[in-house]
Amino acid sequence: MLFMMPSLEDRANSGLEMAMEGVESYLSLGIPKNKLVLGLPWYGYRYTCIQYFQNNNTCVIEKVEFQGAPCSDAAGRQFTYAYIKNLMNEKNITQVWENDTATPYYNYEDPSVSDGTIQMRYDNPHSLKIKIDYAMNLGLLGAGMWNANSLDPSDSAYAILQRAEMWGVMP
């Protein structure tokens, strides 16, 4: 799963370049393309910015290691896609698109944290489709997600649309 690669960045945990790097590393080991499935998250990470630079939208996060390796996931907290979208709607937050990782994110203010800025990093149907298209065009066996219960299970029109959009991009 590409999103489990160690890093200490306040960036997407499953950016396009990371997907490409991960796939290439398996291919360089001689793993056949038709045996690989690209794993993608249906969740995201919430990071508390210990310092936030608005001029270049950089969120400096706490330096945390996991099993001896730098790990941004350990510095953040995982949230479901349903939670991420609900918070975005509830607080009327505008999503930002990061071109070099092909992923969305957003910032919001929380007065209970040191700098006050929280950054939420996640994938949405558009970013997932870009990565899935990459996998399929490369000739991989497929793409999968973790995990299906990250979506809103209710019968609301919004939840039904959310599920249709997310499942709609899967191969």
Question: Where are each of the predicted segments found?
Answer:
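Hydrophobic, secondary-structure "cap" segments at the distal end of domains
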Residues: 71-139
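Short acidic catalytic loops
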Residues: 1, 141-146
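Aromatic-rich peripheral "rim/lid" segments of glycoside hydrolase catalytic domains that contact
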Residues: 134, 149-171
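Active-site rim elements
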Residues: 9-13, 115-123, 144-149
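Acidic, Ser/Thr-rich intrinsically disordered and amphipathic helical segments
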Residues: 18-21, 127, 159
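Conserved, mostly hydrophobic/aromatic
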Residues: 38, 135, 143
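Substrate-binding surface in catalytic domains of secreted glycosidases
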Residues: 1-86
